[in-house]
Amino acid sequence: MVSCTEFIPMYSELFKYIDDKGGGHDAVVRYWEWVGEEYLRWNLEPLVREKGIEGAWEYWTRSLSEEACDVKMVFDPENGQMMSHMRHCPSKGHLLEYTWMEPYYDYCGHCAVLYKKTLNDNGISQAGDYSGVDHAECRAVKYLTGNGKPMEGWDEI
């Protein structure tokens, strides 16, 4: 069995391998899309199909807790939105600490791509601020597509 501390650099190295040997960044994105469809059909997809944005909230509160993330999350069920500020992503944090490898340059890109189709197919849009990924930080909002834009200040939590 591979531990999570071993999986993280292996995942990053796989992205680099696909990028180098399999057709560049577009091939990596196709891989992320495939993983998203295959993996999320068993956990996120049933939750958002049945519960909408509340199912997304349930999924992320559980998964981010399991990952022991330093994250602040806000749920606004009245406006159909959930916001998160990942103050320190443990996965990217580990990669930044390693001196023996260089992380895949778009490692954090997998988060936006993995979930996009499942969310969109169930009426949920997402936006993200990935300007802080070089120090393991990002912000994201997920919102009901029919509600237009994410609420003001989502990128400031």
Task: Give the location of each predicted region.
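N-terminal accessory segment detector
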Residues: 1-109, 117-139, 143-157
